[in-house]
């Protein structure tokens, strides 16, 4: 019996080490801001049972943000601003986008079943981990699924009472059938 219990304990610790989210270059906190203004803070958020694809480390998210900013700039050029307007992302000292990794304590099914309202599950979840700065808009790249939509954002009338509607989510890989 002791051998069996020892085997279970060793297996648990080995599994924890193999599936650890800690990797070189990964940030688990919002790094100090390079300016004290309002910013868009980007987060790579996984559900408890989500598979880590290293999107925060392999430039997938950075390139996505670059493309979004490029599109936004092209749509504002010669309309509102002569040279266009850029989005103000939260940046690190080296001018790269500050991307925070967070694994939630909620399974994907519990989040994805809420469809377009899933962002109203994600926002309080990230807030419990301290991501609730009133000067930030949280842009979540959610590494799980959603049954209805590929993205959603909070509307003040749907946000939990006492919570600032400051979160948008992109469900990547996205919508799933079911």
Question: Which role does the model predict for each range below?
Answer:
Residues 1-4:
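Positively charged n-region of N-terminal signal peptides that target proteins for export
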Residues 21-137, 141-156:
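Propeptide-to-catalytic entry region of secreted or membrane-anchored zinc metalloproteases
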Residues 148-178:
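Active-site scaffold of zinc-dependent metalloenzymes
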Residues 16-20:
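Sec/Tat signal peptide C-region and signal peptidase I cleavage site
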């Amino acid at each position: 019996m002791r051998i069996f219990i020892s085997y279970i304990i060793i297996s648990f610790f080995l599994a924890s080490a193999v599936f650890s989210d800690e990797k070189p270059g990964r940030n688990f906190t919002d790094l100090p801001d390079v300016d004290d203004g309002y910013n868009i803070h980007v987060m790579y958020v996984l559900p408890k049972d989500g598979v880590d694809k290293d999107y925060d480390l392999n430039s997938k998210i950075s390139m996505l943000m670059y493309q979004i900013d490029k599109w936004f700039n092209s749509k504002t050029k010669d309309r509102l601003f002569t040279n266009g307007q850029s989005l103000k992302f939260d940046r690190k000292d080296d001018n790269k986008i500050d991307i925070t990794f967070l694994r939630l304590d909620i399974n994907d099914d519990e989040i994805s079943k809420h469809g377009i309202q899933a962002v109203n599950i994600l926002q309080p979840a990230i807030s419990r981990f301290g991501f609730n700065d009133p000067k930030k808009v949280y842009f979540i790249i959610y590494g799980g699924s959603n049954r209805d939509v590929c993205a959603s954002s909070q509307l003040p009338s749907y946000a939990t009472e006492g919570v600032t509607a400051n979160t948008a989510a992109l469900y990547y890989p996205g919508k799933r059938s079911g």
